[in-house]
Structure formats: C-alpha cells, structure tokens
Amino acid sequence: MAELFRPVEHERLAVEEWDESRAEEAIRVIVADTEATFDGSRWPWHPGDGEEDEDPNDVYFGGAGVIWALHELGSTGWEDAALTFIDRQRTRPVLDEFTVETSYSFGELGIDLVAYRLTGDAGVADRVHDLVLAQPDSEANEVMVGTPGSMLAAEAMLAWTGNQLWDDAWNAASERVEAARDPDGLWTQRFGAEEARYLGPAHGYAGNMRAFANRGRAPEPANLEPHLLREDGLANWVSREGSRPDEIRVQWCHGAPGMVATLGDLLDLELALAGGELTWRAGPLAKGPGLCHGTAGNAYAFLVLHRRTGDELWLDRAHAFALHAIGQVERERAAVGRGRYSLFTGDIGVALFLRHLLDGEERFPTMGPFDP
C-alpha cells in the first residue's frame, strides 16, 4: 500500500462547534496584535522561521506580506512602511538565487507590487514593470522566484490599473514561461547546480498553470499520473519528480491541498475530491496554523471544493480546520510569548484565511485572480 501521508506530521482535529463570532474575534485579535507590535521599522522575527533576518522586507517572511494582508483586512496607514521596505530591500545584498530582485515572494518585485497597491505611486509602478520584464534568462520556472511570478505581478497591475501596458508585460512573461515548458508539460526548476521538477503551487507545475489559468489561458494540462498516488478513494501528489516515500507531504506548497486549491477548477472532479478527502483524513498539520505548510493553507482546498460542488460538507470541513488553526495560533502565542508575523507562515495569514472563509472567498493570497 502506498503511503499517502505521514501521520506524525498531523494532529488530531480539535472537536469544537463552529461559531462565526469566534472567527471574527480571532481576526480582530490578530490584526490588533500585528498593528501594535510593529516598531516603525519591522516586526519581530519568530524562531519557527529559522535563522533570524534583521530586516525582513519580502512578501513571504517579511513586512510586505504582512501589510498586504493588513490592507486586505481593512487596516490602514501602511503606505510609509511599504516604501521603507522598498528602500531597505534595495540596499540589501542578494544572498542567494531566491532573493534576487525579480523574485515575487522573496525579492523586490513583490515588495514593489504591495507598495503600489497601497500608494498608487507611478514611480513604483515603473519599477514593477522593469522587474517584470527583467527575467529573460531565469531558469527558476516557479511563481515564488521565477518568471511565473512576474506573470502574477503583471496580472495584478492590469487589474489595478486597467492599463494595456500590463497586458503586454503579461504576454511577454507568459511567452517566456511557455517556451520553458518541458515536452511532457512540466517545468524544470534550476537553481545553480541544483535541478528538480516540482508539482505544487509554490515551486512548480500547479503554480505555473494557475498563472495562466487566472486569465483563462491555461495550456494543455500535463499527464500527472506518473506523479500521483491513489488508494481507497484518496489521492496525493509527490512533491517533485522522483521524490522518496518519506518526502510525501500534505501541505499547500507540496501535496494534495495545494494541488486542489490551485488547480481545483482544472482537475477532473473525481480526482479533486480524492485530494480533498486525503487532506481531511490526514488532519490538521502539526507544523502550525499558517498558509504555506499549515492548517489554514490546507483548508483552501475545502473552500475550492465547496465552490465547485456546492456540497456543504466541504464548508463544514473548512470550518473545522479554521477552528483548529485558531487554537494553534493561541497555543503558539502562549508558548513563545508573542505572535508570528509573516504572511505565509504567521498569524496574519490565518486571519486572512478566516476572512476569506467568512466572506465566501476561496482565492489563495498572492495567487490571483486579482480584483480591481
């Protein structure tokens, strides 16, 4: 029997009756704490996010992602902070292939995009445009670092401005991404001497397809059967071609939750349901409540399936994961003595998921489609 998930990476689901006011209060507490903890320059680093970064500015770990979420949650007054993050990022050395200036999640591109959303500054828009067109030789081929992320940035700017310039920029980026596709429909991600072919939304196929599908231009899907694990009505996808059995994941970034949340409208319905069922059976993630590899991120798969099928079962499951994620936020805050301040791994991402759940919204943050 194939191992579709590893129980040690999951928790027993907390049994709690759904209460909308509990979710609203959790949002209020998280937003208030996040606003109050900002020291005018940054939020404190969390030990769960690895080696401390003195000045985290980016969308994934840093301040830009936090203020993106705060803005979406109705918090105001972050324009100066957004511009500060840009200035600070431009003086930082590029540490590795992930922090290049054209990176959507870890570099200047995403920070500039957030700053434009908050300020409408024409100079910032020009810089976003330059960065979108600055990746002709990128071999990252993933949304977080490579040209697919430039597609998302151009799509967002088109939605926010209506300017044809951004349609042209999107087309230029999309042509590069399509040209980089492998004959079997996957993409190869290359970072220095390292090479892999990932399946999930953060680093591979699903995210790239989403960047096309947001505008109704998804190319012919790849045959993912060689990378699919099935058993008793459940389904999961390996994280990358040739993954070892002990590398199986059930997360947004890698595995069934992210594949369903990102490609739920493109997948065969039976397969999407099998991926959702696997996500439910595996249970909340022990890694924490966040978006990238946490309980809230996994629950987006349920929201997508609820929208696609109309079956209230999936909404009930999203409610259950939401309550569990709230409990995880509260326990972690008590253990560490403060919150966790990042969009993809922290509390504010959970708050944004809760807002989406309450508002009937299933779009995963930063992945589009984007509203005007």
Language-model segments: residues:
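Loop/turn-rich, solvent-exposed surfaces of beta-rich toroidal or solenoidal domains
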Residues: 279-314, 321
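Structural signature of alpha-solenoid helical repeat scaffolds
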Residues: 18, 51-54, 58, 96-99, ...
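Extended ligand-binding clefts on enzyme/binding-domain cores
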Residues: 164-266
